[in-house]
């Protein structure tokens, strides 16, 4: 509901006689008075801004005579003028056949109780209250606060209670007779939820039944005309109006409109295999403009970058590896070669063990080959007696990535000298390494032999 009127009331103020109920075929019904939303603010130019007998006196003085009535609607926030003829002959109670109370516009809109969930077989359901669409707007007694309704329900326990209810679906007010009963079998005395406050007020402009809604495909080119209250109707449509764009963007939009999106995967260009970053292909005119640009040198344009030489620095000449001999394995005990396995080379076949008489059996070739260091490709002729110091110093390889270690069983020589020539040498070495015998001095007494 609106919080205040949008038009100025003649005579000022925000008070009037609130119409609560309109009887059928009454003078007020013929004048078009609407329950709950209409406020009688003046009759024949007399402002009704006080709760006194002015309204009764004016009606009694004009029985069976038409009078001009100024009415303010809190639904449309507008003033309208209506003609009504007070009468005692219409067949009901009162000269107008309406129930009224004096209050302010804002107070009437705030004192509304929203009917929420309604339990089945409850007093509210038996009285015909409708969930979410019914609003309790008053009773026979004045209710100005939220607790007034609950106090009224407690005082009418097991007694009929008349309530004025407005329904948003039918856009009409009606009388509801309800009998509060706390023993109905559920929660509360009414068996329904009640909402009160700003979020539970009656909408100012409820939806009009039978109103046509234009669909997106039914839009017309008719101009939009503002309403009387200053608001403009906006059609909720997915079709967007043409946007105002500067003349310079017309060509870009036309060129973009020619682009097509295809679900098929695009062909891979040869540029991907050359290491060039993959960037979107530019139109031909852009490529021509880029080709005419002079090359840029980062060293001259960026002061923080150091200039790089055209190529990598030359490496020193490496000695020829063809003269290198691989020492025999038994001369280098404890030195290991890494595993020669490579994804591109077949594995080395295993050799049978060779046991020579007089010496310890040699391990399998597959056992000690992985313990040797990786040696670059060299000659397969290896001298068993060549010392390690005779090997020339090797420089770093020209390309560490391309260096491969190729070793074969033929590049290794095993000393197969007869054991007869080797055993004495070994015995002599062992004798020479033995600790010399301790010499015992001989005295004169010991030197003479006993007789």
Swiss-Prot record:
It is found in: Golgi apparatus membrane; Endoplasmic reticulum membrane; Golgi apparatus. A lipid is attached at residue 2 (N-myristoyl glycine). Residues 15-215 are annotated as: GRASP. This is Golgi reassembly-stacking protein 2. Keywords: Differentiation, Endoplasmic reticulum, Golgi apparatus, Lipoprotein, Membrane, Methylation, Myristate, Palmitate, Phosphoprotein, Repeat, Spermatogenesis. Residues 194-199 are annotated as: Important for membrane binding. Pfam families: GRASP55_65. The keyword Lipoprotein applies. The gene is Gorasp2. Its main location: Golgi. Detected in lung, heart and testis. Colocalized in a polarized fashion in the acrosome region with JAM3 in round spermatids (at protein level). The modification Phosphothreonine is found at residues 222, 225, 417, 435.
